[in-house]
Amino acid sequence: MSQPSPQRPITIAILAMGGEGGGVLAEWIVDLAEHGGYVAQMTSVPGVAQRTGATNYYVELFPKGGSQANTRAPVLGLTPVPGDVDIVIASELMEAGRAVQRGLVTPDRTTFIVSTNRVYAMTEKIALADGRVDSGALLDGCKLAAKRLVHGDMAQLAESTGSVISAVLFGALAGAQALPMQRTAFE
């Protein structure tokens, strides 16, 4: 289980397409943190349309004891900063690739939780030949970029259990032990 630095917040970026419950997932993380003794903040930047950009959610957590030791309330960020994100959660493999491309995932810091399912981009669908991006190459890039990669087809797992992908991603976050909360706190 990771322990936070008393000088900096825990930073989490979530990339999810419309209807996948990214906002709900972010709210669950905020609720988890607040019940665990953290000051928590969530922001979001909506994508333009389903395959031209996911909605990006950003969550920062700061231990209440840390803010009291500093005698001031923490000032939390509004957007993820490349190279400074502790946990990145992507609901789809291409979104994971975009997180890597944006520099949100780094080998010295980031636990990367990725659903390997694909929703093909318009450019992949309209190509005269097979225009699909190689999923294996995307996953290899994710492995190289992250300190730790947790991956699997979480959309399929959600469907097979009658759940939703946001719940599976929350479970993956609990299982990854990337936050300083006990697994039972996630329940």
Language model region names:
Residues 1-187:
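Active-site cofactor/cluster-binding pocket
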